[in-house]
Design a protein with these regions (language model features):
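Acidic/His-rich, divalent-metal-binding segments that scaffold phosphate/diphosphate chemistry
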Residues: 2-84
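Conserved active-site and cofactor/substrate-binding residues in soluble primary-metabolism enzymes
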Residues: 23, 43-47, 87, 123, ...
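A generic alpha-helix surface/boundary motif
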Residues: 26, 46-50, 89-91, 119-122, ...
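Divalent metal-dependent catalytic cores for phosphoryl transfer on phosphate-bearing substrates
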Residues: 63-165
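C-terminal binding/interaction regions
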Residues: 155-156, 162-190
Length: 202
């Protein structure tokens, strides 16, 4: 098997002593505005952050502080993609480590593409960012070609598009299958959750 394309070369991130050390949402959004000129990419990260937070609160019974971890991981997972595609993930990880950010947040970001970064999702937060990353973008692409956008969107339509290789061809169906196979929820349920929770994100 070939090495991951953007292999990070390690599986441990941050310092355990920094557990629960989190940036504010305001600081995270400021970082996005500075690092990510592309408005569509910023929207993608905001959508993943919102869906991550909603899942933590509604499905995992997380408290607000834990939900913030989930949201921050989603919000920042692609922060270095636009300016540093050849070092994607490495730059944002090293930056967050320099700020002494909670290692759970950093590991979650590092594990959002195991095939690319060589870091396996370890816990439910890691697994859900892997699930939500590709599916969130795919569902938003589907919304953009609909006159009513998210209104009236249903799971059946998304499932049909997933079986159409020419639609949003850059989205890896193999990654989606792998990601969903790591959790105990069916794909259809995840799709409905994303539709319900990211449609209001601007």
């Amino acid at each position: 098997m070939s090495s991951p394309i953007l292999a990070l070369g390690r599986s441990s991130f941050g310092d355990p002593a920094n557990k629960d050390n989190l940036p504010t949402l305001e600081a995270a959004h400021a970082l996005l505005n500075e690092w990510v000129p592309n408005e569509r990419l910023r929207l993608h990260m905001k959508q993943v952050g919102a869906v991550m937070k909603a899942w933590a609160l509604e499905r995992e019974g997380a408290d607000e502080r834990t939900a913030l971890k989930w949201e921050l991981a989603g919000l920042l997972h692609d922060a270095d993609w636009e300016k540093h595609p050849e070092s994607h993930c490495r730059v944002i990880i090293e930056y967050l480590e320099s700020l002494n950010v909670d290692p759970e947040v950093i590991h979650c970001i590092a594990s959002h593409g195991p095939k690319y970064f060589g870091v396996e999702p370890e816990n439910i937060m890691d697994k859900m960012i892997y699930v939500f990353d590709e599916l969130s973008g795919f569902i938003h692409a589907s919304a953009l070609i609909r006159p009513t956008r998210y209104e009236g969107m249903d799971v059946k339509g998304i499932m049909k598009k997933l079986k159409t290789p020419s639609f949003a061809a850059q989205v890896s169906r193999d990654d989606i299958t792998d990601a969903v196979g790591r959790i105990e929820y069916p794909l259809e349920e995840i799709i409905q959750f994303i539709i319900d929770h990211q449609k209001e994100v601007q």
